[in-house]
């Protein structure tokens, strides 16, 4: 049973990571249009704004599910310390990015660049976390 839950956690987290890469692509598309003073792709803006909070929630759920799974399987929280630390870092950055995004109110907002930089870090950490997770699974 635990074996299937581990695979389920991996698949869920991989799906969330793919959705975050799509979210990042939307954000980059919006940013490029804004910086080149081209017309803003309003459909992309709407999708990016609407999906952001959902993805933050899914990222948090993936972390929580993984944490519970490790506790059930091993009885220890720190059994996979690097995977735990990277997952926790992702969650903290997700929350930070979400909170920063709430402060973006105008086109020249100083919060756009920190939002962008945190998003890049999140994506890089998801890649690293995925490799760590595959090492744990296999």
Q: What are these regions, as identified by a protein language model?
A:
Residues 1-138:
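Membrane-embedded alpha-helical bundles that constitute the cytochrome b-like, heme-associated redox core
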